């Protein structure tokens, strides 16, 4: 195995769901900005980036979240950086958000926008993505996990630990974030949380996975 391949595999062996971080160790700005950048540069369906990353460093807000986040008890207390990943709601071709992306970010020529809108409409209708608000949100939420995985992998390559978290009371956490002015519930929902930092102790057990023959099939 060449050096680059080994470096990648080593990072995946290094990564584990860190339940408790060392609160005395902080991630440098350079390293954390790199982690965020890998999230920002992650792929998304039709390049629509249906996410928003909120870095929660405020201790009071972390404490409020802790009351309704059973899966993040130690992580909220000890993580160097704690991120909420929001998924955008109601991403359809004619929304202000998509129109902003097409014109303001991607710089589409005006003459090409109707064709994109038609393609987008057909895609969402054919695959029942636009059936209702829930199917639209689920489509966006799934994509946030691509960014999540990339951020965790880049962290591992930097020797930084992480822990993805779904164990939280969605309604209560939504209420807290809405009351705090952090979450606009008309535009976003909470998809997943993730803590970053440096492990307080080494894992008690090594990484265990199924044999590759049990989970990989080749069709030649």
From Swiss-Prot:
GO terms for molecular function: oxidoreductase activity, acting on other nitrogenous compounds as donors, with NAD or NADP as acceptor. GO terms for cellular component: cytosol. One of its GO terms (biological process) is 2,4,6-trinitrotoluene catabolic process. Its cofactor is FMN. Keywords: Flavoprotein, FMN, NAD, NADP, Oxidoreductase. It comes from the Bacteria. Its EC number is 1.-.-.-. CDD domains: NfsB-like. Belongs to the nitroreductase family. PANTHER family: NADPH NITROREDUCTASE, OXYGEN-INSENSITIVE NAD(P)H NITROREDUCTASE. This is Putative NAD(P)H nitroreductase SE_2073. It comes from Staphylococcus epidermidis (strain ATCC 12228 / FDA PCI 1200). The lineage of its organism: Bacteria, Bacillati, Bacillota, Bacilli, Bacillales.
